[in-house]
Regions:
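Conserved micro-motifs of the catalytic ATP-binding
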Residues: 33-36
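Short conserved segments within the C-terminal catalytic ATPase subdomain
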Residues: 15-25
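Short beta-strand/loop element within the Bergerat-fold HATPase_c
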Residues: 59-70
């Protein structure tokens, strides 16, 4: 087992565009060890991080936090319409199909499936800074 924070920092670095157009913040209140299928957890983490990268404008910030057994990925992108929040985890669903972001609408659905398989809960909400996705693993 490797600490979740270390794994997340590696995955975040891999998900970021090479041009340095995005800022990141990372914080963890502990070194959490998560008992999970490594490959599946990596895929779920990649989906959350790639989603944040896709929906963060140039100069924006992606914030990853681990606290109290919950991992959250927030970004400074546009708020998600309230009616769309419950459906974000559905396969092929896109809150705003007219947006010019790439993606097929499967990433968050895959992440939710992985979280469900491990007995984790997950959710999405809007904050003052932008959208935040989270999953509770402890």
């Amino acid at each position: 087992l490797r600490p979740l924070g270390l794994r997340l920092q590696e995955r975040l670095a891999a998900a970021l565009p090479a041009d340095g157009r995005l800022h990141t913040e990372f914080a963890s209140d502990n070194e959490y060890m998560v008992n999970a299928d490594r490959a599946l957890l990596a895929r779920a983490l990649d989906a959350l991080l790639e989603n944040a990268v896709q929906h963060t404008s140039e100069g924006g910030c992606i914030t990853v936090r681990i606290a109290n057994g919950t991992l959250s990925v927030a970004n400074t992108g546009d708020a998600i319409p309230d009616h769309a929040l419950p459906r974000l985890w559905e396969a092929y669903y896109q809150a705003d199909p007219s947006r010019s972001t790439k993606g097929d609408g499967l990433g968050l659905s895959i992440a939710k499936t992985v979280f469900d398989l491990h007995g984790y809960t997950c959710g999405a909400e809007n904050t003052d800074a932008g959208p935040k996705f989270w999953f509770k693993f402890a």
